[in-house]
């Protein structure tokens, strides 16, 4: 083991001892040989002064002491309310990703290396004092030679070895937890760390963030709801991002918003509309919309517009996930728990062999108390969290895209009610969802669906051959994997498209037109059924 890794291990051990995290560990239902360690560990042989801190606060402070990589891991973990006790999740939400800035001259050197030019050749002004500094990057204000006011984001130097080292220890801890604890295995700690690994490495590529920002800007071009700063692609590199500098009011600065006479009700409702527009219209949503990344334009306080920055983390849903999510929400608010359970099974979110009656009863037990509150006080985010918590007891697979969506919804919802406490999220979202559902089954949408799937017809023969080969192989009678339901649905919709195409050809005077219109009618009817069935 390398000296650096040993030093890091000793550092982790000191933090564990300082914040009594070993006490939290031994409170868990562990195997006897691990519980016996409480009598073996040397630091437990002597009396220790008790800490007047909750378990969540101790964990939060420990992660802060361990540095930026553990801080960001804690922030991501705080969004997994389907896995964590509420008190711990609430404490982890308070983690602040603030670290001292690195040397400004080093920042200038890194920017010049990435751009291949001197700072003075690109910028007429460059502020060496950073505007902000976080664990992954820091930001400087500047002005381009062409006159535009911009911000320059630069990745911290030497991050990859630190990230690799800390991730290695996180994986070791996660694998150990899965081996020794059945309860830990249900939480899939290795999967959680794997998701974090992907997220943290994605954040190191600023070209990815630039592309996300450009896509989001294009989606809301000309919209009164949301403004996204312009990316200056000529000066963007993997470790440097140059984009328009924005001036606005921090969304949590309620006093300044009030002084501007901002319409708080409209501002809160527009936040909800932005969220549902991103999720259902665009299937591309900003997944890191905490208050530090959201501002409000000062231009029209009576018609307030949001400004979003930091698009490093985004999420997207498949059309199937969009459809099932919308239907789940409608079924939930109708208290149709059987429908909710069936939709979870149909979507492949829980195994196909799940007992519907038991799943329905579990959902009813958890969710029915929610309706004791007035409708305006019901939390969408809490609804999703409760549904996912229940589904995990029935072996629901981790759905990273739904985790991001739940996190974003909780942020938007909490923010909306902070701005306007009487925000009725359901009444605000319901018209949008109903309109989206109607558009999904409109003739135009069906035609587009048919056209897109008609393009896949050349692959139909290959799919059929592959299907026959799989059926002929051993284990063909094993229970189908979770993804099989969706594959089968896609195959049937493709078959439906073929029927629609064939029926259209017959109706237009194909080779069998002398048989009359009834064969074409049957083919079109069967095709429509297969295409729109759920």
Swiss-Prot record:
EC number: 2.7.-.-
Organism listed in the record: Pseudomonas fluorescens (strain Pf0-1)
Gene it is expressed from: ubiB
GO MF annotations in UniProt: ATP binding; protein kinase activity
Domain Protein kinase: 125-492
Broad class of enzyme this protein falls into: transferase
Annotated ATP binding sites: 131-139, 153
Compartment(s): Cell inner membrane
Catalytic residues identified in the record: 288
GO BP terms, alphabetized: regulation of ubiquinone biosynthetic process; ubiquinone biosynthetic process
GO cellular component: plasma membrane
Organism ancestry: Bacteria, Pseudomonadati, Pseudomonadota, Gammaproteobacteria, Pseudomonadales
Job of this protein: Is probably a protein kinase regulator of UbiI activity which is involved in aerobic coenzyme Q (ubiquinone) biosynthesis.
Protein name in UniProt: Probable protein kinase UbiB
Alphabetically ordered keywords of this record: ATP-binding, Cell inner membrane, Cell membrane, Kinase, Membrane, Nucleotide-binding, Transferase, Transmembrane, Transmembrane helix, Ubiquinone biosynthesis
Ranges annotated as spanning the membrane: 23-43, 490-510, 512-532
Topology with respect to the bilayer: Multi-pass membrane protein
Family indicated by similarity: Belongs to the ABC1 family. UbiB subfamily.
Predominant cellular place of this UniProt entry's protein: membrane
């Amino acid at each position: 083991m390398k000296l650096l890794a040993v030093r890091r291990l000793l550092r982790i051990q000191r933090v564990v001892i300082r914040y009594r995290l070993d006490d939290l560990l031994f409170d868990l239902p562990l195997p006897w040989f691990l519980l016996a360690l409480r009598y073996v560990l040397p630091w437990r042989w002597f009396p220790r002064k008790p800490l007047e801190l909750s378990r969540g606060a101790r964990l939060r402070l420990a992660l802060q002491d361990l540095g930026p990589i553990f801080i960001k891991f804690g922030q991501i973990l705080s969004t997994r309310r389907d896995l964590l006790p509420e008190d711990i999740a609430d404490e982890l939400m308070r983690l602040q990703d603030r670290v001292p800035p690195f040397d400004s001259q080093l920042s200038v050197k890194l920017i010049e290396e990435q751009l291949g030019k001197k700072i003075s050749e690109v910028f007429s002004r460059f502020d060496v004092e950073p505007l902000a500094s976080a664990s992954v990057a820091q930001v400087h204000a500047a002005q381009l030679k062409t006159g535009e006011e911009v911000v320059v984001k630069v990745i911290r130097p030497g991050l990859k070895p630190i990230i690799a080292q800390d991730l290695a220890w996180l994986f070791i801890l996660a694998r150990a937890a899965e081996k020794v604890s059945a309860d830990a295995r249900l939480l899939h700690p290795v999967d959680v760390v794997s998701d974090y690994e992907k997220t943290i490495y994605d954040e190191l590529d600023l070209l990815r963030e630039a592309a996300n920002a450009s896509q989001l800007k294009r989606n809301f071009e000309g919209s009164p709801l949301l403004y996204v700063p312009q990316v200056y692609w000529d000066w963007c590199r993997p470790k440097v991002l140059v984009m328009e500098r924005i001036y606005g009011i921090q969304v949590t600065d309620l006093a300044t918003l009030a002084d501007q006479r901002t319409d708080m009700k409209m501002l809160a409702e527009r936040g909800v509309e932005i969220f549902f527009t991103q999720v259902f219209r665009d299937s591309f949503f900003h997944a890191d919309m905490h208050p530090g990344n959201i501002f409000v334009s000062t231009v029209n306080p009576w018609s307030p517009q949001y400004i979003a920055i930091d698009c490093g983390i985004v999420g997207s849903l498949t059309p199937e996930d969009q459809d099932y999510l919308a239907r789940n929400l409608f079924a939930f608010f109708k208290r149709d728990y059987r429908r909710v359970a069936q939709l979870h099974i149909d979507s492949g979110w829980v195994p196909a062999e799940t007992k519907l009656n038991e799943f329905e009863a579990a959902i009813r037990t958890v969710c029915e108390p929610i309706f004791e509150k007035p409708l305006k006080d019901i939390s969408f985010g809490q609804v999703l969290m409760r549904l996912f918590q229940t589904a995990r007891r029935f072996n629901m697979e981790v759905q990273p895209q739904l985790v991001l969506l739940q996190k974003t919804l909780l942020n938007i919802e909490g923010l909306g009610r902070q701005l306007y406490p009487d925000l009725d999220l359901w009444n605000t979202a319901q018209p949008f969802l109903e309109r989206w559902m109607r558009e999904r089954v409109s003739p135009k949408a069906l035609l587009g669906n048919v056209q897109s799937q008609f393009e896949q017809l050349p692959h139909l023969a290959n799919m059929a051959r592959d299907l026959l080969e799989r059926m002929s192989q051993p284990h063909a009678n094993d229970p189908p994997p979770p993804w099989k339901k969706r594959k089968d649905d896609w195959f049937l919709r493709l078959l439906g498209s073929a029927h629609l195409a064939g029926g259209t050809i017959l109706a237009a005077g194909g080779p069998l037109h002398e048989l009359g219109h009834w064969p074409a009618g049957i083919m079109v009817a069967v095709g429509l059924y297969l295409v729109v069935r759920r």
